[in-house]
Amino acid sequence: SIQHTRPPHTLGLGLIIRYMEWDVALYRAALEQGMPPAKACLLIETINWQVFGPPIELGFKLSRLRSAKALVRARWLTDLMFAVMFTKPFARTVHPTSGAVAFDVTACPLANYFKSQGVPELTRHAACSLDHQMAAQWGLQLQRTQTIAQEHPLCDFRFVPPKTPQ
């Protein structure tokens, strides 16, 4: 008889993990061909933004139907992302505040995956850097002082409006 087992994560997170597997394969292939590690990491970062940037941009454009305010839209979008894509075993603690979209990620399966593959340095380029590009696309700045990828206990996300010149 066929036994059905439940996958360890949702379809959305499963898709992201599969894409990260492709990142590891491309990174290793680039290194095997003699590409310097820094250049291979930049290659992954560039390609990932080309893949993930357009749907993130579309989501932000559609969020205009909810509000004209960038922070309201960013809060709605990050909540949606954690409901659909960044599901368990991701763990997030939201910090209610009026001047920012603030939350901490306390468990990151992407950082764990890259570490388990022996390429923890790839996490920053394949995943973390996209957060800053996403914030810029939304007209916000991401203030982050620590990441799990850098061996901290959490990733602190603070999406804030850009500082305006005085």
PLM regions and their residue ranges:
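N-terminal accessory segment detector
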Residues: 1-99, 109, 114-126, 141, ...
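Short, aliphatic-rich beta-strand segments
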Residues: 101-105
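Ligand-binding pocket scaffold of soluble enzyme catalytic domains
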Residues: 132
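Conserved SAM-binding loop
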Residues: 157
